[in-house]
């Protein structure tokens, strides 16, 4: 039996049935990481020793009947912007290259309490700023489907790790599409929950009003199970919402009869690759054949999402990243004259070019004389976009959209063209601005053999509708792993 080809829930069942031990599961993941990591570069930190020690502890708790959940004993990879006590947490930046947090992020803690074994921390765009995982100080992650292409970003390490079967599932964070877009590029499933569903405590902030942690896995069942485990009300996060229910697995039902699905005309016009469009519309046809009612509608306001997002996110980032100054933790320049020079040199040497670009942009839009013209206008635009979605959800249960305008671009193509990189988030950003849930599922491949993902968007707190729709489509299409993951089997 090949352990790494199992989904997280399948592996959990086999551990429970004593067909596989937790140590065997962890060793299988470590062996796969050692086999493909030189090509893919999904991880910034691999904690072999800690994972094996934890595997033995978890096995004992399972044997004693103290851990019975579906993810008990299943290994996981964590995006490197979530604090893990005692384990390096770098945000893929030089400035945090030596940072070991004193506490663990709430979402990660929830997983640990459910018996998860952390394999290590995954690569990402520096401070989650980017769409290709090329801005990482620790080198780019490569797409397991084609090593000359990017995995997407900023959670590219998490999505590539799942696609390459280095981990059964992973956690990512999504500020403007950072779970959904790389999931599409890597042919895996990723959920960005409603804002406030998963605690942000211990997530190193980029854009606080937009950031949300979510799962990445091989199928919808895994994602729903992980989301059910990490979602919780947390008084330590002032934006955390006490929900009536955190039950997402009951939505794993193969039925879309009567489900009203809206297709925004504005998402399927110019700028969308023909093969991506064809694959998504084919998937919509499948849902229609299964009884869904599909209709086109107008959502023209979304064209203002990108400028609004980059003003708001950069403004919040310039404030959030002020704490990295070389004083309390992280990198400090070796030679400096006086305090201000130390700040300046530590930040200039510690941050990469994309992070500096966004800090400067954010500082500019918040400066006196420009605040009203940019930041305030962006906040008003955000409110209008939310209203447009509210109106759409009066009529539709689920909105279908692409996750990205193309399949995964080649390495280096977007990195040198910031506008091109920013436009890559065109279909995902509005979901963050409106605080909505979204899921990406693989629906096919283009002529180069690269995965195409379809994004399903739901109303606030209606994850179950998008999970049910995604699950229904998934019953018609078996999961496919890239050749790189299957070599030597």
Residue spans for each PLM region:
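Short helix-loop capping/hinge segments that flank enzyme active sites or metal/cofactor-binding pockets
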Residues: 71-91, 253-262, 315-386, 437-453
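An N-terminal boundary/leader segment
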Residues: 1-53, 289-291, 364, 482-489
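Serine-dependent amide/ester hydrolase catalytic core
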Residues: 13, 301-302, 325-433, 481-487
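Short alpha-helical scaffolding segments that buttress acidic/His motifs in well-ordered protein cores
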Residues: 25-29, 308-309, 355-363
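Structural helix-boundary/capping segments
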Residues: 35, 113, 164-169, 175-271, ...
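Residue-level signal for inorganic ion chemistry
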Residues: 29, 51, 104, 223, ...
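Short glycine/serine-rich loop/turn segments
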Residues: 71-213, 266, 315, 401-419
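General small-molecule cofactor/ligand-binding pocket signal
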Residues: 119, 293-298, 439
